[in-house]
Amino acid sequence: MLILSDLALQLPDLGAFYSDEGIMPRALLLSVQHRTFPNLHMLSGSLLWVGLLHAATAGAALSLLLGYRSRLACAACWFLLHSLHYRNPWLLDAGHSEMRLVLFWCMFLPLDGASPEEKNCSSPATLGYTLQIGLIYLFAAISKSDPVWTREHTALYYVLNQDAFATGLAHWVRQSADSMRVLTQLALALEWSIPFLLWWRRTRWLGLVLLLVFHLSIAALLRLGMMVPTALVCALGLLPRAPRPPSLRPGTPCTLPGPVRGLLYAACGYIFYINVAVLRLWAVPMPVQAFGYVFQLFQSWPMFAPHPGRADGWFVIEGVRRDGTSVDLWRGGQPVDWRVPEDFAPLYPSQRWRCWLLNLYDKREPEVSQRFLEWACRGRQDLYYARLIYVNEETPPPGKPFMPTPEILAERKFPY
């Protein structure tokens, strides 16, 4: 259901996101990112091909939902989602990464009507499933090493002042400095405690309750797209009578073939190693890199870490008409308004647009910015000049004034 919902949300912008007529043609993607995974979406840039692959992914997700040939359906979802996500990686959030990684482990778990013995067997897949979920919270906590998290406890002040994500409730909560300090300490404490509570069966229910409270609180304060629903759905796999995580006592022997068990134990070692390597900035040996690329298990979880970041702002696509008037192409042709928006939500039609635009500013790829400007100007015959502007409103320390600063990312003149 989670995959189907995510696919449905993309339908209005399928051509803009994934076709060669959209914001990231295949040639442009290959110029800014190395290809690391066999990709069906790169075979054609037509909207028809993209739609067919979208339908195939939805079919595999529906088969998985109905329990029909679950293992094959899960493998198809894993492969097709990797293909889709690679086609435009600037659209993704942490929830998409968790979804793909958990699908890998689910391919080796009894998702359909297996016998109770098989469901409760001791398997490296159950170990990997639990380890994967726990590592997300553990390394997200470890990454938060900046003093604003550990000593000053002002991190959530910076997080909730990122208006691209902040909800109306966040605008109200961030006004209290005391609340910010308490919530910062509480958030960090939850991220540290959840992975350990989930690991042992005696404390797992407490861990799941805290995980639920943690993510519902995040959803109330921040618009983070697939992150919250994905985390909650993946946590269902830790409930009793679902694919069960390992205990300290050995269970029924696993029925997976020996080579598969060896592969899964290697994958368990890899996901732990790569999280440490990313955190410590280690040089990863080529054989280890190759293993991660083949099975697409590379990951890192620096969510609002080590510092939550101060960058904030909004986009303006200024189009100057031939009569000299200026309009904002991103706001449907309204007059250009340089004032700070009262509500940032309408500036981002969806979470994928939010991710795309923020990555556009963070990565500063001139060719991508130029392509986006040209795409935004398509069909406009009345323009003389256009420019893509990011109004950077860097969040100052508490008590200091905000100073918006326009930055031009791309511009274009049109011939008469």
Where are these regions (language model features)?
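Alpha-helical membrane-anchoring segments
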Residues: 1-416
